[in-house]
Curated annotation (Swiss-Prot):
Residues 466-501 form the EF-hand domain. It comes from Mus musculus (Mouse). Induction: Repressed in CD117(+) splenocytes 12-24 hours following stimulation by lipopolysaccharide (LPS). This is RAS guanyl-releasing protein 4. Functions as a cation- and diacylglycerol (DAG)-regulated nucleotide exchange factor activating Ras through the exchange of bound GDP for GTP. In neutrophils, participates in a phospholipase C-activating N-formyl peptide-activated GPCR (G protein-coupled receptor) signaling pathway by promoting Ras-mediated activation of PIK3CG/PI3Kgamma to promote neutrophil functional responses.
Length: 673
């Protein structure tokens, strides 16, 4: 028996004896590296230095910060404690109270003639204002206390101390600003930049989405993160609310762009394009936008489109499943966390996952121990998580952005849709099949709209600015000769970037020159964007110009509808009446009435809008706009919206004779004949 056999036999005997005692020996690591959690714990305790105990008082913490500075204003040791206190104190102590304690300490040191301590306190306040200037402007009470502090220094301090309070050297901006948009390399002056979604390369689209995401991520401050953790909501945190709104906008934009295509094969092309965009986002390590795009592709309103998914290639289907697995919430996003831990260089996190970690860490331990002292390890752990996120804001994106394409994406993401509207459009594209179908292979990785209620609905001023920027970009690239107009073909392709076609907001037919001026394009985009962004589809009334037989009043301004013929407009679905100039300002939801039997009665009766009888097409001129349910037809969806223009307007709607009143269904209706 050789030596190895002897050792093996002895090990077996030992294990047998242990098993005989009925208690298995616990496996112990031997000569192995510590886990990352253990390394982080040790490093955190080392960074705390003399405050490595589990608790300390506010005065002890403040005293340690004062001692960090020497007589020349240099840090005697590392700045970890100083940065942690200045970043995290507002979690347990108002900033104005911290400043008041510094003022009291300075006055006491001046009374005892401790000039070095006075100077150290001045250095601390100066460091605070220089590196955390945004906190001062957000708290008026803190500004008042700081002002009193420097007034006291001017009265009781020496020349060296007073020089530190020079306002011209304080409040310097901290951190890099958002990256400036740059034109694509090699872009000549006469070369047109394609502003068409179908012409945008997946690489280009992913880069511009990454730029928008990084610009939004850079605006988030530690105060925003603290507000979310303490309140459990993004309300009151504009930068964080904007970041969440951007993610939700991207997700819904993906859904509506897919549903805006009439045929399954066309929808599959859009699906395939967004899958390739998601793959490129993965390569760019932009996980937040990747989550939004993948969530939009896996949304139940999209995954139920069986006819569309049939046209996807096996490679695209496999890629989507892999991305879904990467962002799955299974085991607390274990797959994503492993991938994120191995990332280096430029990267953007899934913000919702990391905010969830902050909330869990905050709720796990109390702020103070039973004796009233601060729980220092908790504050330090929260600071390390915040510092990790803040460090990512100083990155430099690996890609450039074209300003014109940014304007296009910005306006596209401004559009607002509710879940009900998206589902309604999904069922209009592919109605329910009575036969049982196999379940969809796609699983939603998470609830994409992780902050519910955050809906990106811009105000009219912001929307107008975005439209003006886009129109300027369009004419810069599509009208290089400066004629002041673009062709009908360019107009139709440009309007195809937006899912207006889903709601009857097609480019209006043109007569004569067939070109569109800057004013006409601006009017079209403002009109369509305002409806889709601010009112939502439920507010769209099917207005028609009518002649009232009885005295009728405008529902919007309460004015009398007077005239000989065609005094105003009335909605075909709910019966609401208004002036021509008031129809775009109606803020009442269109509630479609159930179909009634018998004589509907005379039109124009002053009864509530929800119970007003339908129009009699035999006695009034009416315009009918219906939604074609055939997804494969070559025609556009015909127009179940409309805040219609009059027949002599530059946007002339299609006139369809209406011999009999037939109420269309909510999802779709048969074309009028």
């Amino acid at each position: 028996m050789n030596r190895k056999d002897i050792k093996r036999k002895s090990h077996q005997e030992c294990s047998g004896k242990a098993g005989g005692r009925g208690r298995s020996r616990q496996a112990r690591r031997h000569k192995t590296c510590p886990t990352p959690r253990e390394i982080s714990k040790v490093m955190a305790s080392m960074n705390l230095g003399v405050l490595s105990e589990s608790s300390c008082s506010e005065d002890e913490l403040l005293e340690e910060c004062i001692r960090c500075f020497d007589s020349a204003g240099s840090l005697r040791r590392g700045d970890h404690i100083l940065k942690m206190v200045l970043t995290m104190h507002s979690w347990v102590l108002p900033s104005s109270e911290l400043a008041a304690r510094l003022l009291t300490s300075y006055q006491k040191a001046a009374k005892d003639a401790q000039e070095l301590r006075q100077l150290q306190i001045c250095y601390l306040v100066r460091y605070w204002l220089t590196h955390h200037h945004e906190a001062v402007h957000q708290e008026p009470q803190l500004e008042a206390v700081i002002s009193r502090f420097w007034t006291t220094v001017a009265q009781e301090g020496n020349m060296a101390q007073r020089s530190l309070g020079d306002a011209s050297s304080l409040l310097s901006p901290g951190g890099p600003g958002p990256p400036p948009p740059m034109s694509s390399p090699g872009l000549g002056k006469k070369r047109k930049v394609s502003l068409l979604f179908d012409h945008l390369e997946t690489e280009e689209l992913a880069q511009h989405l990454t730029y928008l995401e990084f610009r939004s991520f850079q605006a988030i401050t530690p105060q925003d993160l603290r507000g979310y953790v303490l309140q459990g909501s993004v309300r009151g945190c504009p930068a964080l609310e904007g970041s969440v709104g951007l993610s939700n906008s991207v997700s819904r934009w993906v859904q509506v762009m897919v549903l805006s295509r009439p045929g399954p094969a066309q929808r599959a092309q859009v699906l395939d394009k967004f899958i390739r965009v998601a793959q490129r986002l993965h390569q760019l390590q932009n996980f937040n936008t990747l989550m939004a795009v993948t969530g939009g592709l896996c949304h139940s309103a999209i995954s139920r489109l069986k006819d569309s998914h049939v046209h996807l290639s096996p490679d695209s289907t496999k890629a989507l499943l892999e991305l879904t697995e990467l962002l799955s919430s299974h085991n607390n996003y274990a797959h994503y966390r492993r991938t994120w831990a191995g990332c280096t260089g430029f990267r953007l996190p899934v913000l919702g996952v990391h905010l969830k970690d902050l909330v869990s860490l905050y709720e796990a331990h109390p702020d103070r121990l039973p004796d009233g002292r601060l729980h220092l390890p908790k504050l330090n752990s929260l600071y390390l998580r915040l510092q990790e996120l803040m460090a990512l804001q100083g990155q430099h994106p690996p890609c450039s952005a074209n300003e014109d394409l940014l304007h296009l994406l910005t306006l596209s993401l401004d559009l607002f849709y509710t879940e009900d509207e998206i589902y309604e459009l999904s069922y209009a594209r592919e109605p329910r099949c009575p036969k049982s179908l196999p379940p969809s292979p796609f699983k939603a990785p998470v609830v994409v709209e992780w902050a519910q209620g955050v809906t990106p609905k811009p105000d009219s001023v912001t929307l107008g600015q975005h439209v003006e920027q886009l129109v300027e970009s369009v004419f810069k690239n599509y009208d290089p000769e400066g004629r002041g107009s673009i062709s009908l073909e360019d107009f139709e392709r440009l309007s195809g970037n937006f899912p207006f076609a889903c709601h009857g907001l097609h480019p209006p037919p043109r007569h004569g020159s067939g070109s569109f001026s800057r004013e006409e394009l601006t009017k079209y985009l403002l009109h369509a964007s305002a409806i889709c962004s601010k009112l939502g589809l439920a507010f769209l009334h099917a207005f028609q110009e009518v002649t009232f037989r009885k005295p009728t009043f405008c529902h919007s301004c309460s004015g009398f509808l007077w005239g000989v013929t065609k005094q105003g407009y009335r909605c075909r679905d709910c019966g609401l009446c208004c002036h021509r100039h008031c129809r775009d300002q109606v803020r009442v939801e269109c509630k479609k009435r159930p179909e009634t039997k018998g004589d509907p009665g005379p039109p124009g009766a002053p009864v509530p809008a929800t119970s007003l009888p339908p129009a009699n097409c035999g006695s009034e001129e009416s315009l009918s706009y219906t939604l074609s349910p055939d997804p494969e037809s070559g025609c556009h969806l015909r127009h179940a919206w409309t805040q219609t223009e009059s027949s002599h307007s530059s946007w002339e709607p299609e006139v369809v004779p209406c011999p009999a009143r037939v109420l269309p269904s909510r999802a779709s209706s048969k074309p009028s004949v």
